UniProtKB/Swiss-Prot annotation:
Pfam families membership: OMPdecase
GO molecular function: orotidine-5'-phosphate decarboxylase activity
Pathway assigned in UniProt: Pyrimidine metabolism; UMP biosynthesis via de novo pathway; UMP from orotate: step 2/2
UniProt-recorded name of the protein: Orotidine 5'-phosphate decarboxylase
Chain's gene name: pyrF
Family (UniProt): Belongs to the OMP decarboxylase family. Type 2 subfamily.
Native species: Clostridium kluyveri (strain ATCC 8527 / DSM 555 / NBRC 12016 / NCIMB 10680 / K1)
Length: 291
């Protein structure tokens, strides 16, 4: 199962998921000026980030909206980036957050698990109902693919719906998490986690500890580190013996070069340093908790 590959990679390289949410404005100006087209510029930047962080990153999350916004050239760069990740024998997450049903969802599954946009995992939004998930499951079963399903996110508006309580005083996101966990039992890896993972925004330790205990078989994709206030201490609560989740950092890694004078000349090196720092911060906290 694909989740076993991710689990083993986390054991070897740590918990960092490098977010390739690559806006043109993130790319050094001198680099933008030296390229005639958007496709080559974006891809060269991404390739350098991947090469520089390969030994310290568990996986790469590519947010499709940043590429769609750039039209056909952007989507070509998106496709090239996913293929390059595969060529480097690394794991990719296509951050597409699809949430449709029936034939439309089947086409989304085909688009992102086959052909030009093929990835190892995709992110999905189940809040229209769990029939949004069903068309992807044959790929999980037969094609060694995985899902990260939105359970509880870290944005401010998450409380508008996800935190609504039922008559039994159970929050909606807990119900969604329980359903993901139950469905995931059919797609378990040898590592003890399912190839049906969950997107679990990092908020605070107490809640993380509760969720980790409730959702024992769910491997977490954890946004919210750094820019949204999550700390290594918070994140460690969502892990079990240092595994069971990957922590996404996008701008923090992509824009690390801006912290240094003339950093634009070594943006790949700066990205690697930030990736290693995040990895080591999380590892240190996890080791202290397990010692």
């Amino acid at each position: 199962m694909i989740i076993d590959e991710l689990y083993e990679t986390v054991n070897k390289k740590g918990n960092v998921c490098v977010g390739l949410d690559t806006a043109l404005s993130y790319i050094p100006e001198s680099m933008r000026e030296s390229h005639e087209n958007v496709e080559d510029c974006i891809f060269e930047f991404n390739r350098t980030i991947i090469d520089s962080t390969l030994d310290a990153a568990a996986c790469y999350k590519v947010q499709i909206a940043y590429y769609e916004a750039l039209g056909i050239e952007g989507l070509r760069a998106y496709s090239k980036t996913l293929k390059y990740i595969k060529d480097k024998k690394a794991l990719s997450i296509a951050d597409i957050k699809r949430g449709d049903i029936a034939k439309t969802a089947e086409m989304y599954a085909k688009a992102h698990f086959e052909g030009e946009f093929e990835s190892d995992f995709v992110t999905l939004n189940p809040y229209m109902g769990f029939d949004t998930i069903e068309p992807y499951l044959p790929y999980v079963k037969n094609n060694n693919k995985g899902l990260f399903i939105l359970i509880r996110t870290s944005n401010k508006g998450a409380k508008d719906l996800q935190y609504i309580s039922t008559r039994k005083n159970t929050k909606l996101y807990n119900i969604v998490g329980k359903k993901v966990s139950s469905l995931g039992e059919k797609y378990m890896g040898n590592c003890g986690y399912s190839s049906l993972g969950g997107v679990m925004g990092c908020t605070h330790q107490e809640e993380g500890i509760k969720l980790r205990k409730k959702l024992k078989n769910i491997f977490f994709l954890i946004p919210g580190y750094g820019a949204q206030g999550g700390t290594a201490e918070d994140i460690s609560a969502y892990l079990k013996r240092g595994n069971g989740g990957v922590v996404n950092s996008s701008r923090g890694i992509l824009l690390a070069y801006k912290k240094e004078e003339d950093g634009f000349k070594k943006y790949g090196e700066c990205a690697r340093q930030e990736c290693v720092k995040i990895r080591d911060d999380i590892l240190k906290i996890s080791q202290n908790k397990n010692s």
